[in-house]
């Protein structure tokens, strides 16, 4: 039974990473840029229907909705060789085309005004699915459209489709660069509230860490947006391989995420990927014969902080720990090696886990696309729920407090209806994020379950019966 997923791309960043994601999916499924199945793509063991549907003339169309308040990025996509891939009825550009001016309040207000037109598209796409499982939302938390309009759409999706999963790929700003968006701390705080309350699962894409990895691991001096987005598309595509190349476990979104999220609030996920190679490495063959990849080698490297795509900062008190881990392993893998590797990791205590739950390391073995050549025998993606992610939220709180204390740049927000009478929404958002930090800090302690129950955040009330049976490694 298909479990279709609709992808929503919002704003400049969301549409850019979404575009790279669809390019990669087309490559992996043997679909041409115009949506036609290539002659060589006769494997037949993949499930294209999760992310694509077939038009009357049999060409494949992404289950994607492209939304923006200014035209530049979407015009670039629709002017590319992939222009015939998308359903033009699923592309929405605001008629005035002025954008949100990097202002969350403007993006949110415009989302509210345009909701009828936008949800006509989303509802039509949902109605065209046989068994819709949920939505994937791609956006940035720091700008105007992806953060503001994205927040509005997230809230409405949760209201309109309460039984469907909402997973986001959320890009966090680069902390090593001075932002030209002066209200970025406000935008981030307001978006984080919605990611906490409206999303079921948030994959954090931290630009600080992505740039560091591009420099340190891929040896790219000044990584471009395109190179970073390519890295993101790898994370997105590998995280969905078990849905597109299904086996007996982890073959739907709830089965993938349920073991990672023990309580509703703790749903922010980190990623790691290894081995990493850049296009230049492949072309110059710099990495030939450097390493023989094995399951243990890959799983061990995934636990190294330098491979994590979130910059959490030093853990001076050494109290942060893993809540759960899912490793998606691709390549030539003997299942017995997986069990041996898991045992080795446990015996050597390579990872520190929560004191109130089991050592939860899940492993999903996934086939790779037969149409894309890999340079490695084995590769792996880690999706991890780790308490140190709260340092990212603490950083956002500190930046917000500095700006809010001075009362800086608030006039831009007061112009919009949501802030016309007062600034309560900002303060409530701060409180939500502060509670989130406390929740993750509490998760490092043995008494976490009592803390969580007091707050009314018991174990996840799943949106699917499937999740109750997902408890062991898919190997």
Swiss-Prot record:
GO terms for molecular function: GTP binding; guanyl nucleotide binding; microtubule nucleator activity. PROSITE patterns: TUBULIN. GO terms for cellular component: centrosome; cytoplasm; gamma-tubulin complex; gamma-tubulin ring complex; gamma-tubulin small complex; microtubule; nucleus; pericentriolar material. Tubulin is the major constituent of microtubules. The gamma chain is found at microtubule organizing centers (MTOC) such as the spindle poles or the centrosome, suggesting that it is involved in the minus-end nucleation of microtubule assembly. The keyword Cytoplasm applies. Gene3D superfamilies: Helix hairpin bin (1.10.287.600), Tubulin/FtsZ, C-terminal domain (3.30.1330.20), Tubulin/FtsZ, GTPase domain (3.40.50.1440). It is found in: Cytoplasm, Cytoskeleton, Microtubule organizing center, Centrosome; Cytoplasm, Cytoskeleton, Microtubule organizing center; Cytoplasm, Perinuclear region. Interacts with Ote. Residues 453-475 are annotated as: Disordered. Pfam families: Tubulin, Tubulin_C. GTP binds at residues 142-148. The gene is gammaTub23C. SUPFAM superfamilies: Tubulin C-terminal domain-like, Tubulin nucleotide-binding domain-like. Keywords: Cytoplasm, Cytoskeleton, GTP-binding, Microtubule, Nucleotide-binding. Disruption phenotype: RNAi-mediated knockdown has no effect on nuclear positioning in fat body cells. This is Tubulin gamma-1 chain. Belongs to the tubulin family.
């Amino acid at each position: 039974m298909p479990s279709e997923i609709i992808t929503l791309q919002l704003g400049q960043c969301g549409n850019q990473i979404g575009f790279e994601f669809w390019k990669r999916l087309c490559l992996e499924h043997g679909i041409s840029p115009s949506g036609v199945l290539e002659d060589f793509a006769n494997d037949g063991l993949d499930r294209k229907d999760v992310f694509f549907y077939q038009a009357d003339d049999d060409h494949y169309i992404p289950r994607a909705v492209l939304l923006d308040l200014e035209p530049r990025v979407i015009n670039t996509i629709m002017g590319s060789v992939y222009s015939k891939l998308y359903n033009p009825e699923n592309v929405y550009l605001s008629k005035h085309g002025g954008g949100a001016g990097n202002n969350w309040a403007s993006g949110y207000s415009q989302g509210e005004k345009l909701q009828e037109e936008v949800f006509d598209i989303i509802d039509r796409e949902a109605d065209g699915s046989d068994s819709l499982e949920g939505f994937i939302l791609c956006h940035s938390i720091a700008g105007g459209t992806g953060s503001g309009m994205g927040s509005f759409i997230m809230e409405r999706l949760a209201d309109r489709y309460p039984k469907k999963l909402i997973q986001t790929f959320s890009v966090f700003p680069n902390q090593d660069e001075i932002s030209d968006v002066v209200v970025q701390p406000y935008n981030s705080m307001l978006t984080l509230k919605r990611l906490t309350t409206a999303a079921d699962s948030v994959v954090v894409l931290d630009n600080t860490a992505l740039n560091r990895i591009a420099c340190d691991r891929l040896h790219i001096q000044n990584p471009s947006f395109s190179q970073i987005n390519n890295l993101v598309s790898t994370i997105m595509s590998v995280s969905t391989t078990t849905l597109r190349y299904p086996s007996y476990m982890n073959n739907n979104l709830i089965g993938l995420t349920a073991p990672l999220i023990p309580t509703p609030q703790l749903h922010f996920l980190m990623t790691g990927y290894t081995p990493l190679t850049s296009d230049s490495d492949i072309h110059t063959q710099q990495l030939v014969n450097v390493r023989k990849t094995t399951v243990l080698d890959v799983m061990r490297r995934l636990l190294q902080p330098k491979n994590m795509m979130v910059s959490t900062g030093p853990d001076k008190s050494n109290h942060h720990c893993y809540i759960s881990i899912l490793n998606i392993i691709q390549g030539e893998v003997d299942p017995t090696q997986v069990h041996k590797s898991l045992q080795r990791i446990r015996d050597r205590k390579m990872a520190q886990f929560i004191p109130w739950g089991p050592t939860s390391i899940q492993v999903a073995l996934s086939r790779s696309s037969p149409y894309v050549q890999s340079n490695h025998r084995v590769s792996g993606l880690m999706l991890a729920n780790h308490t140190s992610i709260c340092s990212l939220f603490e950083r956002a709180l500190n930046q917000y407090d500095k700006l809010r204390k001075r009362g800086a740049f608030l006039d831009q927000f007061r112009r919009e209806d949501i802030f016309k009478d007062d600034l309560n929404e900002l303060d409530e958002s701060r409180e939500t994020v502060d509670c989130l930090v406390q929740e993750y800090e509490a998760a490092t302690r043995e008494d976490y379950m009592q803390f969580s129950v007091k707050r009314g955040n018991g174990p996840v009330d799943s949106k699917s019966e499937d999740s109750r049976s997902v408890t062991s490694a898919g190997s």
